[in-house]
From Swiss-Prot:
Pathway: Cofactor biosynthesis; molybdopterin biosynthesis. S-adenosyl-L-methionine binds at Y32, G69, S123, M206. Signal peptide: none annotated. The gene is moaA. One of its GO terms (molecular function) is cyclic pyranopterin monophosphate synthase activity. Belongs to the radical SAM superfamily. MoaA family. PANTHER family: MOLYBDENUM COFACTOR BIOSYNTHESIS PROTEIN 1, MOLYBDOPTERIN COFACTOR SYNTHESIS PROTEIN A. SUPFAM superfamilies: Radical SAM enzymes (SSF102114). [4Fe-4S] cluster 2 binds at C269, C272, C286. This is GTP 3',8-cyclase. The keyword Nucleotide-binding applies. GTP binds at R19, R65, T98, K172, R274, I275, R276.
Amino acid sequence: MTDATSNLDSHGRPLGVLRLSLTARCNLACPYCCPDSRDPEGMLDLQDQLRLIRVACSLGVHTVRLTGGEPLLSDRLEPLLAAIALDRPAGLKELALTTNGVLLSPERALRLKCAGLDRITISLDGADAASVARMAGLQGGTPAGQSLLDQVLVGLEAARSAGFNSSHGALKLNAVIQKGRNDDQLIPLARLARDRGLELRLIEYMDVGSRNGWSLAQVMPAMEMVQCVSSHWPLDPVGRSSNSTTSRWRYRDGAGYIGVISSISAPFCGDCNRIRVTADGQVFTCLFASQGVDLRPYLRTDESETQLRECLSELWTRRSDRFSEERSLQIDKEKSHAEMAYLGG
């Protein structure tokens, strides 16, 4: 077996996080994500997923985050959690989920908690009906936005009631902020999160994929977001932990924390420890990559898992990605990227 400590990429970064997409489909149509309406062919089955997680953990992965599309649309979610719980890899410290929360009923939240899920992050890009409708790509206008907002808030409370403790970081709120579209929602979202004891993470609008018409002019820099929030509720810096995507700030009045993810204005490529595997088994070593490597031949023909382990290990040790840093140097400006919903964020 490969020694997990020997798996450093060409920049000395260890492998630590596997983001595993369960589906490319989504029940929303957020314009910055542009999800697909159907899944790709050749989806990984349960045994493929389990083998992948087991081998990834043997190479140093300590956190598995289940993503989409919208993972709650996948009929693979609960069976996967149940199977992991039966034989959880020794190195797997955290099993997390990112969702829009629409399908997170009280019953389902409890099932997920009982099945061994450790953390849930819910995405919400507005705090009023019109903004929610606009950012989710809804056709029904304000009434549809209000219905969606109500569902997400129910999902948040369902997760809390199921035992996902926000004060311990087990329940967080994500928001993508796009200048000119929902930057007016910064303070309302911060207020919503503060009132509910949630840590809000504000994400810069990213140039992932080619469908969303990304422009640098639409990016609100993280520090500008921080200054905006701090003008209402003073903040003190906490910093960014090694390998984390989030720089955190503490509310001076004791109302918790807020975070920013600044992949455009202040890239954190230097200690990125993530790989992403799509629902059809393509592995990507960078969110901004244009092409992945198909793992299915290794997953389905090698019961010993040796070839899969060697493939992942070689892929990681040869890894040299630092796209966000290169973006600032105007390198590879015309390079195409895989789509956000396909990669799983």
